[in-house]
Amino acid sequence: MYLEVKNLKKSYGKDQSYIQVLKGVNTSVKKGQMCVIQGTSGSGKSTLLNCIGGLDEMDSGSVTVDGQEIFGLKPAQLSDYRRDNLGFIFQFYNLVPNLTVRENIRVCEYLTDDPLDMDELLETLGLTEHQNKFPSQLSGGQQQRCAIARALIKNPKLLLCDEPTGALDSKTSRDILVLLEKINAKYGTTMLIVTHNNSIKNMVHKVIFLKDGLVIKDYENETRVPAAELEDL
C-alpha cells in the first residue's frame, strides 16, 4: 500500500476540555487512487488529513507514506517530508495578492528539483490566458485552479484536499472535480479528498467514512461515475 494508517489516535485539550478526536483509525490507500474521506461534522476528517500531512502531531499510531513512517519525525524532518511528498489544497486559496498567477505557482516550483512543466500545467488547468493576472482579477473557480496548480507544480506524490469545492457554486465545483479527475489520470497523483458532499464518493476509487473518530466504512468503488456526470453538487 502507498498510504497506511494504523491505530491512529489524536486528542486535544486536557482535564475537562479533553476530547479524543481520532480513536484508533485504520485504513490504507493504493498508489494512484483518488480517495474521499467523509463523515459528519466533528468526526475527525480534517484531523486525519492533518495528521497524514504532518500538520498536526498524532498522539500514537502509525502513518506510513511510500514506506516512510512519519510518527516521531523531528520538525526539520517533517518539513522535508511535506516538501518532498505532499501537495495541499484547502477551501480557501491563500494566494499572494501582489503576485500573478504564474508567479504564485512558481513560489512552489522552487521547492523541488523535478517540477512539472509550467506551461503544460497551465494549459491542463485552463490558466494559460490568465497567467499574468493577479488574484483579484480572477473568479473563485480560477483562484482555486491557481491553488491547485501551485500544489501540483512540485509534482507531489500525495495530494491532500480539504473541502476543495466548499466555497464554490455547483457548476464551478463540478469543473474543479473534473480537473482533479483529469490530473489523477494524467499524472497518477494519489489524492485524499475531505468533503461533506455526498455525490463525490461516486467518482473516486475508494471511500472512507468516519464517525466519532473511527472508520465505520472503508471500501473501493467498483462503479465510478465521471465527475462531469455527478449530480447534486
PLM regions and their residue ranges:
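ABC family nucleotide-binding domain
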Residues: 2-3, 8-203, 209-210, 215
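Conserved beta-strand-loop-alpha-helix hinge in the C-terminal portion
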Residues: 214-233
